[in-house]
Amino acid sequence: MESTPLQYPLGLKTDSLVKQVSEVLKSLTVTKAVGAFIVLFIIIPKVFDFLRNLFSPVTSIPGPLINKFSPWPLEIATFKGKSHRFARALHRKYGPIVVLAPGMISIGDSKEIKRIIQSEDWVKSEAIYGNFRQDFHRPTLLAFTEKKAYSRRKRMLSSMFGIRYIRSLEPLMKSCVDAGVAHLNKLCDNPSKSTIINLQHFIHGLAIDTIGVTTFGGSFHVVENGSHPLPSRLKAGMKISAVMQLISWIKYIPFLPKRDPYIEKFTFDIVDKRRKEAGAVKHQDLLQHLVDVCDDSPGSEFRTSDVQDESVILLAAGSETTANAELFTVIQLLKHPEKMKKLIAEVDKWYPPSEPDRATECAYSQTGMTYLQACIDETMRLIPGQATGSPREASKQEVLLGYKIPRGTTVFPNTQEAHLDGSIWEQPEKYIPERWLEIYSRNQTSAMPYWPFSAGSRICVGKNFAFQEMHISLTTLLRKFTFEYVPGQDETTVFRIAQQLEADSYKVRVKKRF
């Protein structure tokens, strides 16, 4: 049977179509080619994005019109480290649910937040955490968005964060705090006079050294020496990571390495050293647990690169969040001297000044020193590390506060809004640790809309580690030294992975108590 020539629109045959396309290509100048590229790959996709956003149910949610069609306001705020203030201002103006950007909303209602992060345990947002990875296909525990894969990784690492194991790290934590005490003793050489120190640098150095000795088997000696390349590079990396969560195109910049070369070499070398020491040297730190479960065979879910990435997250996130919580706690106490006086009385009750050489012991005092815990909890209520909450994703069409939420929408369960809800907390913006003593007495801590470590299956695995470190550090420092407030300090915060001071320095006066 005779074949029929393939027909095209407008009756063009194959050879005719090829000829016309060839003529069009010949007529293209560089300017026209660039123009065509812009139209095809920039303008047309933007038009489709605009139309999709125009007809999305998200446009019915309160918020500025520009936020519903452009990510720029949120991206600019994120780049400046002000996304938490950006969201706070929107909630104050528009209410408990607001649009942050196309496909992204923030919810400030405590009941809906609990539903999202705890009762229904929504998955983490792929739009956010998909960009928080050194290797897109191999996320860390923090950045998993698929529940089953996350559960497997969590089971693999769970023994590292149990109470029993965390307690075994107490001597290592104490060694760092002792080094910090020795350093302050040198600075306070005149017992009758106070000395001005950079409290921010000191507490961050102490936290970094603690994570170093418990994770990598050795202190970085930041407190004594003032700095170390690894934590400095990690801090810079955290700023980039915070921006990349929302401004993902940065990762497509040519020749931009996936990992900082210094961090890559440092972590690879230390893992390699551990393997060579296997059996000969016994290590009891967190890194050894990672190395023990590492397997580089084909198909392995936990390779050497995963050990490197998890150890970096432990160091960066662990030191940063704990240090900020400690720092803000001390700042709040310095600004409220009557609270500081009350806490010192509790410290002296458990560790009498007549026993200066007695070691601080968590097993002895952590659960009993309720006012210290109240001071920490009240600080984290007012200044939560995860200010805008851990972003989740609607895996199906949902309804929040009566508004339809399309599948795939990123939802920020806004922690700071719940923590400052005047219908739940009396005088919500005031520092009142005593409110927690009543909550503890009624055994209602878990019932409160209070999520500094998130909740549900994605609750921070390092919670017990952080509380133990803070208890040892703060109790020991308040036993040995008196801290005095220096007026005029910049207390503005920025939000980059964790809420932190914008300034690089926070000065206080310190002197020996005895």
Swiss-Prot record:
Binding residues for heme: C460
| A family per Pfam | p450
Keywords attached to this Swiss-Prot or TrEMBL record, sorted alphabetically, are:
Glycoprotein, Heme, Iron, Membrane, Metal-binding, Monooxygenase, Oxidoreductase, Transmembrane, Transmembrane helix
Q: Which residues are glycosylated?
A: N225, N443
- Cite a single GO MF annotation: monooxygenase activity
| Membrane protein topology class | Single-pass membrane protein
User: GO terms for CC?
Assistant: membrane
Chief location of this protein?
A: membrane
Q: Which cofactor does it need?
A: heme
Classify the source by domain of life: Eukaryota
What PROSITE patterns would the database entry show? CYTOCHROME_P450
Kindly list the residue ranges recorded as spanning the membrane: 28-48
What is its subcellular localisation?
Membrane
UniProt function note: Cytochrome P450 monooxygenase; part of the gene cluster that mediates the biosynthesis of the mycotoxin fusarin C. Within the cluster, FUS1, FUS2, FUS8 and FUS9 are sufficient for fusarin production. The roles of the other FUS members are yet undetermined. The fusarin C synthetase FUS1 is responsible for the condensation of one acetyl-coenzyme A (CoA) unit with six malonyl-CoA units and the amide linkage of the arising heptaketide and homoserine, subsequently releasing the first intermediate, prefusarin, as an alcohol with an open ring structure.
Q: Which family does it belong to?
A: Belongs to the cytochrome P450 family.
Query: What's the protein name?
Result: Cytochrome P450 monooxygenase FUS8
